[in-house]
Amino acid sequence: MKKILLASLIAVSSQFALADNAPQVDPAFAKIETLVKAKNFNEAYKELDKLAQTGNAQAIYDLGFLTQAGQGTTKNDAKALELFKQSADKGYPTANYLLGKTYISGGLGVKPDQKTAINYLEKAAKQGIEEANVDLAALYLGENKDASTKKALKLLDPLVKKGNPQAVHLRA
């Protein structure tokens, strides 16, 4: 599990330049990525905290991730949840998606709350996270109402056309 969390943190923290005009990797995140790869979580946490103090939504999210995992700091689900909410409030798409999933399942000490889950997933979907549309569609289909089914299909059909495997599976 820790390897998955570590890989996810590195993936989230990295901004890969795939084109000549793509933005350069933020040097602060490059340093943090190096620290994480070296498993120096205490220093990575300190560097993220400095960056988070400037209001950087990704840094706040990553602090939540480390706090949830107990890497570089004491494991604390309540604090992690608060950090994820702060990041989402600043418009970080991944935080909105994670919170949506959290409120579906009831993780991080919260009780499952479909209304709150839908709120976060809708924000994540509007911010371009396709998986949020799939999760929303699954929630709507679970309501077993004609209007909800229509909403679900409206979300799924564009993804099916793009070949999204989760959408194809859910649509079947």
Predicted features and spans:
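Hydrophobic face of amphipathic alpha-helices that form TPR/SEL1-like repeat modules
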Residues: 62-69, 98-106, 135-142, 172
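Structural signature of tandem alpha-helical TPR/SEL1-like repeats
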Residues: 39-46, 74-83, 110-120, 144-155
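Solenoidal tandem-repeat scaffolds enriched in leucines and small polar residues
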Residues: 126-128, 138, 142-147, 154, ...
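Canonical positions in the second alpha-helix
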Residues: 50-51, 86-87, 123-124, 158-159
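Short helix-capping/linker turns of helical repeat alpha-solenoids
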Residues: 23-24, 40, 53-56, 69-71, ...
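N-terminal leader/linker segments that initiate helical-solenoid repeat arrays
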Residues: 2-54, 58-62
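Terminal, low-structured helical/coil segments at or just beyond the last alpha-helical repeat
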Residues: 25, 170-172
